[in-house]
Each structure stands twice: as structure tokens, then as C-alpha cells.
């Protein structure tokens, strides 16, 4: 039976356990994703408490991390989503995304509405990808793809 969580406490604790086990075993999120049939971004988000994993994927990941049956069950529960407090993020990486939305949020909104009309881009019917590419000017660049289904506003 599908279960849902009413607080973030258990998933936050599990996320801490996952990160520690991942470090102890020197595994990457890509390695943890192997054999799940899911994307690296989705599995990573699930392990950090933002998605439920299907039973078979939860078992694959738990076996790699040495997690118990309770952890497998928790990984399958629908979480109470949202992990950023109602304040400006202080982690430098997360803050840069916040900054990007501060600078480009209204631009993104204007362009989405101009191209699609009144509506939103789903974060549920959604794909995320992160790639590292060489910068021709030296160093590396992060290519982040946010691919969400457009959902029009429906008058009622």
C-alpha cells in the first residue's frame, strides 16, 4: 500500500545516513543509480528526501549502501517535499541558483508565458540533467537542463 509521510524528520535522518554510507563506501550517485532504471537526478533527489523510489529501486540502492528494511520502506514513502528553509539559502551552490532566479526569474516567466501562454512548468512531470563540459576558454562549464511539462491555466 502506498504510504505518505507527514513530516520531514525521518527522511532528513535517512538522507544523513545515506550520505554517510555513500561516503564510507566511496560511491557516487551515478553508481547508486545503476540498476534502478531511473535517472541519476531522480535517484539523487529521492536519496536526499524529495521523491519516493519504486520498491525494486529502493532495494537496489539500499543493498549498495547496506541499509536495513526500514530504510527501504522509507525510501518508498511519498515524502513531504521541500528542503530549503523560508530564508535566503546560505550554501554557496544553492545560493547561486537562488541568485540565478533573482536575476532571470522574471525573464524566464515572461518568455514562458510569451511562448506558451498563461500556465506553469511542472516540477512533477519533470526531468533534470547535469553535465560537465569543457569550456573553450579554459576550465569547465555546467550544463543544467530543466525539462518540465507545460501545464496551461484552465479557466473555471
From Swiss-Prot:
Keywords: Lyase. GO terms for molecular function: cyanate hydratase activity; DNA binding. It comes from the Bacteria. CDD domains: Cyanase_C. SUPFAM superfamilies: Cyanase C-terminal domain, lambda repressor-like DNA-binding domains. Its EC number is 4.2.1.104. HAMAP family: Cyanate_hydrat. This is Cyanate hydratase.
Amino acid at each position: 500500500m502506498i504510504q505518505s509521510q507527514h513530516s520531514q524528520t525521518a527522511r532528513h535522518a535517512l538522507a544523513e545516513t545515506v550520505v554517510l554510507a555513500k561516503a564510507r563506501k566511496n560511491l557516487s550517485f551515478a553508481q547508486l543509480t545503476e540498476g534502478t532504471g531511473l535517472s541519476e537526478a531522480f535517484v539523487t533527489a529521492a536519496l536526499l528526501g524529495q521523491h519516493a523510489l519504486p520498491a525494486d529501486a529502493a532495494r537496489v540502492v539500499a543493498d549498495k549502501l547496506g541499509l536495513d528494511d526500514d530504510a527501504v520502506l522509507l525510501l518508498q514513502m511519498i515524502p513531504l517535499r521541500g528542503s530549503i528553509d523560508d530564508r535566503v539559502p546560505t550554501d554557496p551552490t544553492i545560493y547561486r541558483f537562488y541568485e540565478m532566479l533573482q536575476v532571470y526569474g522574471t525573464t524566464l516567466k515572461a518568455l514562458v508565458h510569451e511562448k506558451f501562454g498563461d500556465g506553469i512548468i511542472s516540477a512533477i512531470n519533470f526531468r533534470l540533467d547535469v553535465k560537465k563540459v569543457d569550456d573553450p576558454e579554459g576550465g569547465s562549464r555546467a550544463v543544467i537542463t530543466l525539462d518540465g511539462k507545460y501545464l496551461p491555466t484552465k479557466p473555471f
